Regions:
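Acidic, divalent-metal-binding catalytic cores of TOPRIM
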Residues: 1-180
Length: 180
């Protein structure tokens, strides 16, 4: 990307995957050297930004074909799905650390793993696979309310004030041509 002779702002938006914070910082540093505006989501993937109980409830209430859905029922189900997926986060972070630290001793690797896991699970809604979350939630909504659900279904039901700051800020910067 350093061959950008046209002086056109180049933007790349990426999921963090299960990369460590150190790896992500290094990628951002490399991107700046190459004149690439790189933004790595703070959440696991873009779908995680659509995990909003109010927007999910609005969509579900409007489109359900059977049953009665309420905020307490939906909130409980969302927490169940998140809890189900937390184990995947632990496994995938550990796998990534092992793959990238073959020469690091086991004690250091375990400490790094625990630090990354604590950081990610500070808010499990952010760390889980958003795609898998909506897949599991959709299985439940189809069975109980005869409606599929996905991030794309939910996003139009966000109120302006519900749009996550990170998303709104990034869109604003790109639209105005600012560097990230």
């Amino acid at each position: 990307f350093s061959c950008n002779n046209m002086k056109v702002a180049l933007y790349c938006i990426s999921n963090p995957g299960y990369h460590t914070r150190g790896e992500i910082k290094e990628r951002i540093r490399e991107a700046k050297v190459g004149s690439l505006n790189l933004h790595v989501w703070q959440k696991h993937e873009i779908d995680n930004y659509a995990i909003n109980v109010d927007a999910i409830l609005k969509y579900s209430t409007q489109h359900k074909r059977k049953g009665k859905i309420s905020l307490p029922i939906l909130t409980k189900k969302i927490e169940e799905v998140v809890n189900t997926l937390e184990g995947d986060v632990l496994e995938n972070i550990s796998r990534e650390l092992i793959a990238n630290s073959a020469n690091v001793n086991a004690i250091h690797n375990m400490a790094l793993s625990n630090e990354e896991i604590d950081h990610r699970l500070n808010n499990p809604h952010d760390a889980i696979s958003g795609k898998k979350f909506f897949e599991l939630l959709s299985n439940w909504t189809q069975e109980n309310y005869e409606i599929p659900i996905s991030a794309l279904h939910v996003i139009p039901y966000f109120e302006r004030h519900e749009v996550p700051n990170e998303v709104a800020s990034l869109i604003s910067k790109i639209m105005s041509g600012e560097n990230l």
